[in-house]
Amino acid sequence: MSCRELVILGCSSQQPTRTRNQGAYLFRWNNEGLLFDPGEGTQRQFIFANIAPTIVSRIFISHFHGDHCLGLGSMLMRLNLDKVTHPIHCYYPASGKKYFDRLRYGTIYHETIRVIEHPIDKEGIVEDFGNFRIEARKLNHLVDTLGWRITEPDTIKFIPEKIKAAGLRGPIMQDLLRNEHVTVNGKTLYLKDLSYIRKGDSIAVIADTLPCPSIVDLAKNARIMLCESTYLEEHSHLAESHYHMTAKQAATQALAAGAQQLVLTHFSARYLNSKEFEIEAGKIFPNVTAAEEFRSYPFPKNPSSK
């Protein structure tokens, strides 16, 4: 079974602290590495996390404020240095194309990796392929900003006791999957009676924003909702003026979305203890954690979920 986890590579906002680097978030999932908003120093954070950067296959930039993208250039150069053979897909708001190019080509180096750009100029499904469906929606920030929902496909799971009772095994199982029915000893057996659909898991990544309807749409029933909460309620006036959320607001959005787990991040440097965010949000949404540098949040596949 492939590794399925969120790894926090950084969880500060614009200004890093002694214990928190600028944000960067890695989802290891279905043999891919999904890297979100690599801030300054992300390449080095991989070393401290003891994770090979070569796992990265897709990079998502929510918007082009520096703390969400300054690590992009060095990450691409590192992947180039490591001679990765898989393509690197990059997703970002189309309005930020010039900033993407500046980050990618800001220094002299010989690029040999294959970078596939996905500049996004409209909301909805960005890609739908074997491993994932990628959805983007606009958030409410000071510049064009995207939130993300990543969903794995549904899968058909056989019900072991029914398969055993029917006496099915071997190649006929593939026939059953392909044709949705088989005939055994003159009796027709149907796939729908011997199996169930396992709904694919979803994760949501909510970057800088005020509360808005897109958040609930993206995080609906998500296994993990990774969400910015730059401020505590005592500084809600700052959150509003800078187009950010408080921990309480993030928790309210998670509750409305029916998310299973909320991971708060993007903490202002004014706060030394991120546990205060957990306490504030936990009054509304109990299954909440304040992100910690290099902490891992597994979300193992539940084979019996329907």
From Swiss-Prot:
CDD domains: RNaseZ_ZiPD-like_MBL-fold
HAMAP family: RNase_Z_BN
Bound cofactor: record note: Binds 2 Zn(2+) ions.
Function: Zinc phosphodiesterase, which displays some tRNA 3'-processing endonuclease activity. Probably involved in tRNA maturation, by removing a 3'-trailer from precursor tRNA.
Family note: Belongs to the RNase Z family.
Annotated binding of Zn(2+) 1, by residue: H63, H65, H141, D208
Record key words, sorted: Endonuclease, Hydrolase, Metal-binding, Nuclease, tRNA processing, Zinc
GO molecular function, one term: zinc ion binding
EC number: 3.1.26.11
Assembly behavior: Homodimer.
Organism: Chlamydia abortus (strain DSM 27085 / S26/3) (Chlamydophila abortus)
Highest taxon above the source species: Bacteria
Amino-acid positions noted as binding Zn(2+) 2 in the UniProt annotation, renumbered to this chain: D67, H68, D208, H266
Chemical reaction(s) catalysed: Endonucleolytic cleavage of RNA, removing extra 3' nucleotides from tRNA precursor, generating 3' termini of tRNAs. A 3'-hydroxy group is left at the tRNA terminus and a 5'-phosphoryl group is left at the trailer molecule
Active site annotation, chain numbering: D67
Protein name per its UniProtKB record: Ribonuclease Z
Known cofactor(s): Zn(2+)
